[in-house]
Amino acid sequence: MIKILIVNMILLITQQLSAKDYDVRDFGAVGDGIFVNSNIIQHAIDYINAAGGGRLVFYPGTYVTGSFYLKSNVTLHIEQGATLLGSTNPWDYVKDPHVGWKSMIFAVKQDNIGISGKGIINGRGFTTANNMVKYIQKGLFDDPLKLDRPNETNRPENIYFRECNNVVIRDITLKDPASWNQTYDQCKNLLVDNIFVDSKSYWNNDGIDVVDCDGVVIKNSYFDTADDAICFKSHDANAICQNVVVDNCTGRSSANGLKFGTASRGGFRNFKITNLTIYDTFRSAITFAAVDGGLIENIVVDGLRSVNTGNVLFLRIGNRWSSGKTPSLQNVTIKNVYAEVPYAKPDAGYNYEGPVEDNPRNISPASIIGLPNMRIKNITLENIEMVYPGRSDTLYAKVGLTSKELDAIPEMEKSYPEFSQFKELPAWGMYIRHADDIHFKNVTFRALEQDYRPAVVMDDVKGASFRGVSFSEPNAQGKNQIFKYKSSGINIE
């Protein structure tokens, strides 16, 4: 799968490099940071498309624009020193009727398109969103202002591509959207390579959203985001996000580093994630959320370094919007991981940092949590070291190991999935519930200070193996670090 994807992407890049160049200024564009160029850019794209294709080149300057549509066989090439600057007038953006979102750059049902160059796409999202709030308050725009902000579909993204084939996004900087930064929805053959994403200007600022796509490579890229950094979604129960490679990427988030979900109607299949670095992240380094009736299967994570991140791994089956379908999460291998979980809030001081919780909990463990009739199956954790702070305080929060306490942990099957949703959990390293065939190989759990909880708690687990698993905790000689409850087929070597 990976070799085929890479060959296809090389062919796409070669095709783009051989395209004819057109200077956007020859069509009347003005890069003075004032003139709004939307209509001129659209005319240039239409012309190049009709002429058989080519590159629309933006030379150094600041080109203000609202919405426009990229078309087949056209690449936007933004030179170093050039900026596509989003208009701060919300009326300069359209909501596409097929997509249902606003964006600066749209493409719908187009082939052989791309964005390249060392330049910048800057949505100026904070100002644009606040201007929209003013229009809403004047009654000029219809929006309920839920949570005191416009709905995310009414705020412009930087990029939204829907049902496009052969897409290349290379070398650019994407910053300051008013909503999600870039979405690729039901696209085939997508390459994202060597991009820099700064997405901390407003709420819901995901770094990249890949929705129900087939054949995706994301590599050599950096994401600094207020919301999920790298996010895979499945909006269509009859579609699936599949055949995806993520390699050599770095993420920083006030939500999750890399996430499957939350929208998970169809599901996710055949992913390989390698050499991923996550730091200063509020929630989980990687979240797997099968909560809307879809599947998550055949996933390999090989190489994760997670530092100053609130949680390492969160694997969850829920029953939120399943509509009669049964979600599944199975056949996941996670290996070659080093992770440090801090005691303090990891994203303190960042723009739009994660919320301060109003219910107390000690540091949460990594977790694998299914439901009694929807079990997580066949998970392998190999060559992993997880370092926790310890320091749990029973006066702050406590869940012990009695039947009454363990049974009182809620299922929360309809709740939004988040590693901290259960509040206090009875383990400091790993909590596993309603799962089958969970395998640990060469895994180290390390607590820097003493914790009242054992490292691992299994509740209703059928089949688990521990090979080469070690525990380090001060003043814990003789402590039973693996606790089994209502579990069977547990092999500890």
What is the role of each PLM region?
Residues 1-8:
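Sec-dependent signal peptide recognition
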Residues 11-12, 16-493:
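Extracellular/periplasmic carbohydrate-active domains that bind, remodel
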